[in-house]
Amino acid sequence: MMSDNKVERLLEELQITNPAGYELVQAARQVVYSVVPNASERVMYGGFMFSGGEQFCGVFAYKEHVSVEFGRGCDLQDPHGVLEGSGKLRRHIKLFTPTDIKAKFLELYVDAAHRQV
């Protein structure tokens, strides 16, 4: 698990300004690190971008949900029908509650995204 001071500062800010979002972000980060223990993490675009050589996903907190973004999500298989987005490349999974992490098979999609880069 490699992160930097910017990651810690953004987490601290989130904890104060969006406690529910902070908890979901932390849970999503745990999933990423459980799948890719050596992932590196940095702050980009107001969220947390994860790389394992190449960027494979990002975690972003919004007022009502947390979004896990996949830059090449268009190439991911979606057997559970949870990927959202209709753009050319990007897809995302919206998390509203901690139970969404398992219900939307986040670990499976993070693993698939990491394997495709």
Residue ranges and their predicted role:
Residues 1-117:
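Charge-dense, helix-prone N-terminal extensions
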